[in-house]
A protein has these predicted regions:
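Conserved small/polar residues in nucleotide/adenosyl-binding loops
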Residues: 316-317
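Short, surface-exposed beta-strand/strand-loop-strand elements in extracellular ectodomains
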Residues: 90-98, 254, 258-265
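Solvent-exposed, flexible loop/coil segments flanking beta-strands in beta-rich domains
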Residues: 1-89, 159-255
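Short beta-strand-plus-loop segments that form exposed binding edges in beta-rich domains
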Residues: 154-157
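Juxtamembrane membrane-water interface segments of multi-pass membrane proteins
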Residues: 141-143, 248-255, 262, 305-309
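A cross-kingdom feature marking solvent-exposed beta-strand/loop segments within repeated
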Residues: 65, 104-144, 273-307
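Short, conserved beta-strand segments of beta-strand-rich sandwich/propeller modules, principally
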Residues: 149-151
Length: 318
């Protein structure tokens, strides 16, 4: 099965794909700098030094003076690289069992520039949403695919802390070959994705106004101890968004915490969702307004854009 780079970018925002079970052999995970003194012994089901907290410089092994941060057989893709404190030591990425690295650049610049090496002039990426600085942590959400093998090394002086998030695909999947030229070739597609991330929450709302989407507007008053049907359907459908608009000035956490959402799918007797509205919309007592891809909150409105297909459904609030 051939997967294009555009297909990989689509996976980063398409909520419908979350409702499709992964293929046999597909798995996701993360390589990080966690303290290797922490370990688990499956033979005794015990943890050793689980409180070890030197999480800034762990690695798989050393190769001369470079640490190996990531190593995996393909096919797979690196989705995200993060560091709390990237510095000038180089990151090197090797793919497809090649001896020469596909990427060789200062770790800090990985979060600011297109990938480059000695043969290529530095080029600012200008992707504030694909390369955001969050709580001083640096992020890079630009996929790096590989078919047979991938290794990431870090030179001395690289900094502290890293995450490398990945998906490993079944052997039948064929991915595009990563190169420095690829990032330049797909810059328009990356710019479109960057804009999508900027419009997170807003774009999902607009997508749910399309012709093939039915929007139900409901007004409910729910007294203490009362249970009301929020929505019911005996026909196959997919819920793609749920909004809550408060009739008061603010959508207060205290009110959301008192109300519960319960969802039954396909005639089930046991509810599949049972939580407070605060939990459903990702709201805590101290939360301010925010917009993420699946959920968002403004002063008066909460929204969730989880894609939920079913043969029939019954939604209660109480």
């Amino acid at each position: 099965m051939k997967v294009t780079y555009q297909d990989l970018l689509e996976k980063m925002t398409n909520m419908e794909m979350l409702a499709i079970p992964p293929e046999k052999g597909e798995m996701g995970g993360n390589f990080s700098s966690y303290d290797r003194n922490s370990s688990y012994d499956p033979s005794t089901d015990t943890y050793s030094q689980w409180g070890a907290n030197r999480d800034c410089d762990g690695y798989i092994r050393m190769e001369k003076d470079r640490l190996v941060a990531f190593e995996m057989e393909g096919p797979g893709v690196i989705w995200r690289i993060w560091s709390a404190n990237p510095q000038e030591g180089h990151i090197r990425i090797y793919t497809e069992n090649e001896q020469k690295e596909k990427m060789d650049m200062p770790f800090r610049k990985l979060f600011e520039r297109y990938a480059y090496d000695e043969s290529r002039v530095e080029w600012p990426a200008n992707f504030p949403e694909l390369m955001p600085i969050l709580s001083r942590g640096r992020n890079r959400f630009i996929p790096i695919p590989f078919n047979h093998y991938c290794k990431v090394t870090l030179d001395p002086g690289w900094g502290e802390f890293y995450h490398i998030t990945y998906t490993k695909f079944p052997s039948c999947v064929e991915l595009p070959e990563y190169s420095l030229d690829m990032e330049i070739e797909v810059q328009t597609a990356l710019a479109v994705l960057d804009r999508k991330f900027y419009l997170r929450g807003k774009e999902a709302y607009e997508a749910n106004q399309l012709e093939n989407t039915l929007v139900e507007n409901l007004t409910l008053n729910c007294e203490a101890g009362e249970q009301k049907i929020l929505y019911q359907s005996d026909k196959p459908l997919a819920i793609s968004g749920i909004w809550l608009l408060a009739d008061e000035k603010q959508c207060a956490w205290e009110d959301l915490e008192k109300l519960r959402m319960e969802i039954y799918w396909d005639g089930e007797k046991e509810k599949s969702v049972s939580c407070s509205l605060a939990s459903f919309f990702g709201v805590i007592k101290e939360s301010c307004e925010y917009r993420s891809w699946p959920v968002s909150k403004t002063e008066r409105e909460c929204a969730a854009f989880w894609y939920m297909p079913c043969k029939s459904c019954l939604l209660y609030t109480s």
